[in-house]
Regions:
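Thiol-/selenol-based redox modules, centered on thioredoxin-like
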Residues: 137-140, 144-192
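N-terminal "domain-start" segment that seeds a small globular fold
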Residues: 20-52, 72, 136-137
């Protein structure tokens, strides 16, 4: 009888490591997520932009367009940037022509438009695609749970905002229609 009991206990413990291995691999998924600091992109002037230079700063990544009903958000983005740029916060704009061809211009035309109409001084990157088969790798990172460790999501429209912490990890996604000075964005920036 003792042998049967001992064998039962032994079998029970023999089965447990598989569960432990499974839960251990599930628990390690977040450690496999990427940081935006791993990316190097091209800015609107054709120069290399290394996101690792932003370590220690909170980052807002936003896809932009010049001929969209939300284009006036450039004004709010610029005001937000000027208020917090000296407090370890930066906005990175990515022009994209994915929604109703609302960003048809060249990089030079986009830069001129942003400067002339909104005084944009936050870093603007070269025009990319934020969805579909031509999606830029940085947006694959932002929209894929396997890469960002937060969630799968889609860019819904121009001016969708991605908030990343000082380590470059995605923390929050803000809908396009939410203004840059929205209380939830301000709270996130100011949170220690």
């Amino acid at each position: 009888m003792f042998n049967i009991y001992a064998l039962s206990v032994l079998c029970l413990f023999a089965c447990m490591p598989n569960e432990s291995k499974q839960s251990m691999s599930e628990n390690t998924l977040p450690s496999m997520k990427k940081s935006i600091h791993e990316f190097i992109v091209t800015d609107i002037n054709g120069q290399s932009f290394d996101f690792s230079t932003l370590k220690g700063k909170k980052i807002m990544v936003v896809n932009t367009a010049s001929k969209c009903g939300l284009t006036p958000q450039y004004k709010g983005l610029e005001a937000l940037y000027n208020t917090y740029k000296d407090k370890n916060f930066v906005i990175i704009g990515f022009p994209a022509n994915d929604f109703m061809a609302q960003e048809p211009g060249t990089n030079e035309e986009i830069a001129t438009f942003c400067s002339k109409n909104y005084g944009v001084s936050f870093p603007m990157m070269s025009k990319i695609s934020v969805k579909g088969k031509d999606m830029h790798p940085i947006y694959r990172f932002l929209t894929s749970l396997n890469e960002n460790g937060l969630e799968d999501n889609q860019v819904k429209w121009n001016f969708q905002k991605y908030l990343l912490n000082e380590e470059g990890f995605l923390e929050k996604i803000i809908p396009p229609s939410t203004e840059p000075d929205d209380e939830q964005i301000i709270r996130w920036i100011e949170a220690g």
